[in-house]
Amino acid sequence: MSASYLTDPLIFVIDALLSLYILAVMLRFLLQWCGAEFYNPISQFLVKVTHPPLKVLRRFVPPIGKIDTSSLVLLLALQMLSDFSVLMLKGVMLNIGALALLSFTQLVTLLLNVYVFSVFASALLSWFDPGGYNAASSILRSLTEPLLEMCRRFIPDVAGVDFSPLAALLLLQLAKMVVLPPLQELANLIG
């Protein structure tokens, strides 16, 4: 039996649990930043799940304007913990700068993926239940509307068809192609 027989399942569990919690913290940050409905059941779930560590962090890390900096600090700390744990179990050690940059890159990737999923899901929901209300569509609308509104300024409706979701998806994919490779390369150089 190889060593990976035991470490691979452990890596999977650590990565899965921390990734889910990181996603919850990121969604809470984004929904708070976008001004999403606080009493929405999804918002309430995210607040309750992420409140304990944020309550402690807020004593030391105050918000800056509309930006909840304690959520950002928690995101980076959790991602660094996840990356450090996984790399350590794989026998790879990085210096703190490379680890921080790797974690930042993964958070930017997650942010872009959250928006890609949100725009896509919001567009699908608008086709099947236009004007309908449910907790998920309200959250998705709050999250995507600022980005879609920006796209609508440049791309008007054509024959009643809104192409802003398509434009937003193209912009998000372009951002992935332009922003992420230099960050990954820099992390490789530092590490």
PLM feature spans:
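Selective transmembrane helix interface/packing segments
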Residues: S2-G191
